[in-house]
């Protein structure tokens, strides 16, 4: 069995006085496209920075491609590439100068592949960085990452500012990158419909905690949503059930099949099931964020 690309063991990072990332424990398989999803402020960018070796760790252990990020940060950065709208290359003036500068740090830089990527992305070496659109800067960041032939590619909102055709091209390039089975991608994006199509592993973050993770098919089959009538006292205290929304006795309930008692045990009690449906990745994330497991619910919440 191959060593995982990423291993988090009780990782904790105090991002600010009011926000703590973790503790997180997670393994991301080598050769996977992992979707890192969650609402704004969940801790996704902070985690990506730690994986890149540019973010500090307050407790726990982080292994990337078999290296401890706190002890082998240089090696981690050499084998890992980050694509982010926050990276600025304006200081070098043009695309060509930027490429000349960045390529000098990487002995494995593939100049021919870089030229091919520029053509496919519609970029020219003579273009000035400050003339690029937001989407153009994302494309340049992707070119610089892919031309390195890194083993781990980290992407932070790479489809931001891209039109549908450019987003399709982005994923085409990512799939080409993944033809080498030793490579791994971790991608953070709010385009969950696209991630559901391409990602084979998902990690969901909320308020600095991992609320769900697993292969995409397993995660989507693990959860279902019920439209129910609550028992007379209107309380939910059953293992595997999370209240998503409520209006009087009627409620939407998220069911975690992995946490439910065995069939026939009467786990649903007096709940009267009106309907049941499977969830998309986006719907599952929203339901997990909105729900509150193991808490007695009394307030009314709209079902719309």
Regions found by a protein language model. Name each.
Residues 52:
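Helix-to-loop junction immediately C-terminal to a conserved catalytic motif
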Residues 60-71, 76:
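Conserved ABC transporter NBD signature motif
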Residues 1-23, 30, 35, 73:
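A short, flexible loop at the N-terminus of ABC-type nucleotide-binding domains that lies
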Residues 171-258:
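ABC transporter nucleotide-binding domain
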Residues 84-140:
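ABC-family P-loop ATPase nucleotide-binding domains
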Residues 37-39:
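The feature captures the beta-strand-to-loop junction immediately N-terminal to the Walker
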Residues 153-157:
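Catalytic Walker B motif of ABC-type/P-loop ATPase nucleotide-binding domains
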Residues 224-302:
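Short, charged/small-residue-rich alpha-helical element at the C-terminal edge
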């Amino acid at each position: 069995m191959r060593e995982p690309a990423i291993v988090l063991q009780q990782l904790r990072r105090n991002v600010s006085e009011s926000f703590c990332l973790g503790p997180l424990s997670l393994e991301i398989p080598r050769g996977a496209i992992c979707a890192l999803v969650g609402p704004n402020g969940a801790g996704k960018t902070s985690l990506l920075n730690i994986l890149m070796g540019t973010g500090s760790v307050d407790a726990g252990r982080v292994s990337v491609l078999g290296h401890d990020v706190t002890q082998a940060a240089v090696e981690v950065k050499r084998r890992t590439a980050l694509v982010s709208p926050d990276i600025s290359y304006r200081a070098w003036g043009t695309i060509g100068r930027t490429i000349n500068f960045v390529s000098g740090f990487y002995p494995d830089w593939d100049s021919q592949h870089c030229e091919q990527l520029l053509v496919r992305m519609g970029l020219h070496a003579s273009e000035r960085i400050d003339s690029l659109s937001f989407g153009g800067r994302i494309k340049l960041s992707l070119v610089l990452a892919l031309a390195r032939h890194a083993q781990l590619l980290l992407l932070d909102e790479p489809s931001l500012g891209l039109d549908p055709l450019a987003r399709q091209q982005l994923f085409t390039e990512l799939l080409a990158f993944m033809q080498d089975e030793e490579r791994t991608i971790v991608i953070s994006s709010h385009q969950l419909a696209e991630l559901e199509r391409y990602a084979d592993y998902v990690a969901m973050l909320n308020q600095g905690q991992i609320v769900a993770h697993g292969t995409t098919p397993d995660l989507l089959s693990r959860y279902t949503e019920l439209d129910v009538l609550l028992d007379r006292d209107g309380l939910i205290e059953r293992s595997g059930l999370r209240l998503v929304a409520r209006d009087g006795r009627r409620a939407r309930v998220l069911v975690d099949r992995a946490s439910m008692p065995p069939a026939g045990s009467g786990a649903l009690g007096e709940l009267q099931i009106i309907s049941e449906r499977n969830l998309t990745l986006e719907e599952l994330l929203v339901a997990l964020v909105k729900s509150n497991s193991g808490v007695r619910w009394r307030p009314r919440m709209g079902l719309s």
